[in-house]
């Protein structure tokens, strides 16, 4: 859910341009590989919202949007664990999002309703109206649980890091995540109705994270040039 539809498209274009610029102009490193992937994903989510509002395939694009943002926590955690340099079977991180993505694709009535209002795109999914509340619980636990784990690992890496520039990079990533996603977590718990709408955070998060990515990639590029 985001301001529609021109803001969604403009945000998507901005993110595609920034992600491409990072790939082209910044030296290759784990951080500068992660940022483009993540920003392209955020940009595609904004694109799905634009398509939802401007085509006759609203249900399809609503599903694509759900699938897109469902993979974000797994990508976050994948990145954080890679930073720790621990051995880990990364494929296991994607079991839950793959399951719910397949569910969304195969279930014809997965999207209950979708609409574009003056300011927002509102999508209501069967996942949160299911007669099996366990599915909603698993999805919510995965989503916010992985984000919490990401923050935990990143904070741990930050505390161990001696390089001042790298510490700044980790702090920027951590702050962008904390500021934008924890309000959604609180609203998700305090206001149950918000569970239909919490992806709206990605409109604000996309812009903020893109700015954070530019700064962090610039700093990381300075480190890579010194090597």
Task: Write out the residue ranges for each language-model feature.
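Juxtamembrane membrane-water interface segments of multi-pass membrane proteins
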Residues: 22-27, 81-90, 152-171, 218-226
């Amino acid at each position: 859910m985001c301001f529609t539809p021109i803001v969604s498209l403009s945000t998507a274009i901005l993110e595609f341009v920034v992600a491409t610029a990072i790939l082209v102009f910044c030296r290759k490193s784990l951080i500068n590989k992660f940022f483009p992937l993540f920003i392209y994903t955020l940009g595609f989510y904004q694109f799905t919202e634009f398509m939802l509002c401007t085509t006759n395939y609203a249900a399809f694009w609503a599903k694509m949007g759900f699938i897109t943002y469902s993979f974000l926590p797994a990508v976050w955690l994948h990145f954080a664990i890679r930073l720790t340099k621990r051995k880990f079977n990364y494929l296991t991180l994607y079991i839950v999002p793959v399951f719910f993505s397949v569910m969304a694709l195969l279930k014809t009535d997965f999207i209950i309703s979708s609409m574009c209002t003056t300011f927002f795109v509102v999508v209501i999914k069967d996942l949160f109206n299911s007669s099996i509340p366990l599915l909603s619980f698993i999805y919510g636990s995965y989503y916010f649980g992985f984000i919490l784990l990401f923050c935990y690992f990143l904070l741990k890496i930050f505390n161990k890091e001696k390089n001042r520039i790298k510490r700044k990079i980790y702090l920027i990533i951590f702050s962008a995540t904390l500021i934008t996603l924890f309000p959604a977590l609180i609203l998700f718990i305090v206001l149950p109705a918000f569970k239909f709408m919490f992806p709206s955070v990605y409109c604000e998060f996309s812009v903020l994270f893109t700015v954070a990515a530019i700064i962090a990639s610039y700093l990381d590029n300075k480190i890579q040039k010194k090597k």
